[in-house]
């Protein structure tokens, strides 16, 4: 084949892949610059069905794609060049695999003759993501390989996929055609003649039926299950599962609804949101120990107390409802797992429990904690929990919330306020890393343009400083609230042997502030040390069309001392 034909065929294959991905539901493509991925990049540049997002750092790019996929509820494509560019996606791919988020990596690669021989920027890319992605290895584009074969390969890998896919794309040089003009996918091209019908339509070449199989109990099984004292525990649920339906289910059965930070129901007035704290409240815990049936929606519970409660209780019946076949119970309880969305399971023919309202006193205990937190957090000293509660109480219907790992998400789980409504809430709790949190929030903010708040710790923000470049490009509100306690002060809550070891090897104090970082990326910045100033800055930031930073500086021990004091009060109640 002439070299010019090589460049053209490379481009045609890139265009076929991206066109088919668009037909399979992809709305966004995230791209990092690089030469070996040129056929994909040039095809993406001409693809009108995809929104393009560019960033120079592949690690941040992967997490931005993760955020876009979470917010759009659709697969997102990622284009990278060869070499370590691909490896930099690994953390985001791990998180996506564990939380069933569909990312599609399109990695440019060297042809076989340039692998394992010292060629530049060439590593073994197939299988680079190990168990965390479905692997597809494409050959170098070849006129003898029918375009239909390429499309069916993409279709089989991507259709109905809820987890990452890695499509490795080998290309020989030349990569750059001499000119770009006209349609890449020309119906008059002899090579594309077999695809004339496909080119005229808007559907995938291969159309797969939905593969999810739902399972549900019989009416008789439901009747037996609800005959006793039970609780409903709600773990991580995505917004599209319509968790609000579980409120009605709880009220119909007459069992309390115990909600995790990631349930979309943590602040709902009809839920028992303070369950983490109630499990150290003596009277509440004694009451909860009477339960002999549990219905768990989702998994990846945040509270160790709730996890211990589920593990230690002697359950007569334990049901768990998951949207996919998965094993999400580190305590390995004997149980029956049903495959359904929360909304679908709540719509079954449920009966009133014979022990309905058995735990109504929990409402009183939950209210007691609500008043305790108002007095001791909202009206107490300025600190991390106070800021988190203020954010959770501010315009929840107007915005979406991304809560960072380590201390922020635990403070929200322990102390989030009861509210009329809850902002749509996102976390990265698959692998629970502190990497890529800002980039993920940028992806969430970029999809719809809805105001978004990120609550992030100082070490997490330092870890993802490059992603301020993504934030700079946003045209919708993203409020980056940095809780700066000068290090990893979650370790104040853990039994590290002594204070010197804690300081030298765990907390890693840095003495840094973020004003110059904000200035470097030309982002609005405020540093606050009291609640009134925070509220003013926060409301202003929610109305600003772009990203802005609010830095909250607190002492290293503020949050841990407050947690200890509140724990003591709860235990003595």
Curated annotation (Swiss-Prot):
Its cofactor is Mg(2+); Mn(2+); thiamine diphosphate. CDD domains: TPP_PYR_MenD, TPP_SHCHC_synthase. It catalyses: isochorismate + 2-oxoglutarate + H(+) = 5-enolpyruvoyl-6-hydroxy-2-succinyl-cyclohex-3-ene-1-carboxylate + CO2. SUPFAM superfamilies: DHS-like NAD/FAD-binding domain, Thiamin diphosphate-binding fold (THDP-binding). GO terms for biological process: menaquinone biosynthetic process. GO terms for molecular function: 2-succinyl-5-enolpyruvyl-6-hydroxy-3-cyclohexene-1-carboxylic-acid synthase activity; magnesium ion binding; manganese ion binding; thiamine pyrophosphate binding. Binds 1 thiamine pyrophosphate per subunit. Keywords: Magnesium, Manganese, Menaquinone biosynthesis, Metal-binding, Thiamine pyrophosphate, Transferase. InterPro entries: DHS-like_NAD/FAD-binding_dom, MenaQ_synth_MenD, MenD_middle, THDP-binding, Thiamin_PyroP_enz_TPP-bd_dom, TPP_enzyme_TPP-bd. It comes from the Bacteria. Pathway: Quinol/quinone metabolism; 1,4-dihydroxy-2-naphthoate biosynthesis; 1,4-dihydroxy-2-naphthoate from chorismate: step 2/7; Quinol/quinone metabolism; menaquinone biosynthesis. Its EC number is 2.2.1.9. Belongs to the TPP enzyme family. MenD subfamily. Catalyzes the thiamine diphosphate-dependent decarboxylation of 2-oxoglutarate and the subsequent addition of the resulting succinic semialdehyde-thiamine pyrophosphate anion to isochorismate to yield 2-succinyl-5-enolpyruvyl-6-hydroxy-3-cyclohexene-1-carboxylate (SEPHCHC). Homodimer. This is 2-succinyl-5-enolpyruvyl-6-hydroxy-3-cyclohexene-1-carboxylate synthase. It comes from Shewanella baltica (strain OS185). The lineage of its organism: Bacteria, Pseudomonadati, Pseudomonadota, Gammaproteobacteria, Alteromonadales.
């Amino acid at each position: 084949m002439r070299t010019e034909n090589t460049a053209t065929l490379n481009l045609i294959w890139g265009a076929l892949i991206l066109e088919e991905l668009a037909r399979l539901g992809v709305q966004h493509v995230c791209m990092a610059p690089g030469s070996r991925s040129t056929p994909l990049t040039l095809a993406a540049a001409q693809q009108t069905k995809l929104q393009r997002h560019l960033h120079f750092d592949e690690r941040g790019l992967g997490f931005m794609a993760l955020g876009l996929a979470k917010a759009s509820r659709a697969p997102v494509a990622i284009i990278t060049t060869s070499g370590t560019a691909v490896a930099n996606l690994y953390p985001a791919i791990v998180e996506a695999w564990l939380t069933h988020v569909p990312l599609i990596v399109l990695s440019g690669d060297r042809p076989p003759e340039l692998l394992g021989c010292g060629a530049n920027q060439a590593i073994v890319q197939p299988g680079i993501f190990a168990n965390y992605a479905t692997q597809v290895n494409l050959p170098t584009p070849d006129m003898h390989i029918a375009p239909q074969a390429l499309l069916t390969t993409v279709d089989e890998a991507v259709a109905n996929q809820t987890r990452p896919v890695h499509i490795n794309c080998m290309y020989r040089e030349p990569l750059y055609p001499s000119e770009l003009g006209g349609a890449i996918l020309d119906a008059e091209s002899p090579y594309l003649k077999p695809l004339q019908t496909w080119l005229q339509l808007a559907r995938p070449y291969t159309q797969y039926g939905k593969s999810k199989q739902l399972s549900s109990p019989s009416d008789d099984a439901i009747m037996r299950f609800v005959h006793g004292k039970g609780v409903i525990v709600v773990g991580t649920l995505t917004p599209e599962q319509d968790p609000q339906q579980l409120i009605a289910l709880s009220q119909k059965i007459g069992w309390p609804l115990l909600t995790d930070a990631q349930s979309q129901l943590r602040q709902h007035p009809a839920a028992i949101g303070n369950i983490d704290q109630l499990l150290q409240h003596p009277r509440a815990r004694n009451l909860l120990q009477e339960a002999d049936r549990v219905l768990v929606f989702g998994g990846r519970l945040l509270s160790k107390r709730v996890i211990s409660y589920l593990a230690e209780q002697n359950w007569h019946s334990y049901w768990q409802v998951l949207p996919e076949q998965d094993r999400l119970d580190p305590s390995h309880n004997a149980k029956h797992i049903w495959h359904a969305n929360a909304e679908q399971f709540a719509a079954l023919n449920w009966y009133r429990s014979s022990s309905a309202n058995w735990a109504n006193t929990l409402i009183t205990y939950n209210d007691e904690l609500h008043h305790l937190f108002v007095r001791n957090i909202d009206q107490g000293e300025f600190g991390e929990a106070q800021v988190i509660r203020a954010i959770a109480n501010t315009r929840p219907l107007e915005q979406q919330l991304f809560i960072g790992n380590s201390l922020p998400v635990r403070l929200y789980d322990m102390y989030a306020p009861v509210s009329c409504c809850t902002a749509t809430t996102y976390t990265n709790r698959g692998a629970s890393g502190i990497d890529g949190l800002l980039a993920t929030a940028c992806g969430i903010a970029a999809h719809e343009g809805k105001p978004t708040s990120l609550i992030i710790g100082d070490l997490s923000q330092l870890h993802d400083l490059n992603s301020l470049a993504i934030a700079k490009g946003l045209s919708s509100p993203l409020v980056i609230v940095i809780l700066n306690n000068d290090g990893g002060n979650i370790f104040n809550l853990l039994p590290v042997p002594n204070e010197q070891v804690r300081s030298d090897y765990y907390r890693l104090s840095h003495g840094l502030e973020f004003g110059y970082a904000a200035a470097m990326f030309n982002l609005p910045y405020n540093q606050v040390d009291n609640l009134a100033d925070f509220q003013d800055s926060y409301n202003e930031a929610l109305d600003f069309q772009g990203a802005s930073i609010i830095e909250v500086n607190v002492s290293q021990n503020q949050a841990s001392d407050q947690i200890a004091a509140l724990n003591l009060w709860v235990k003595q109640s």
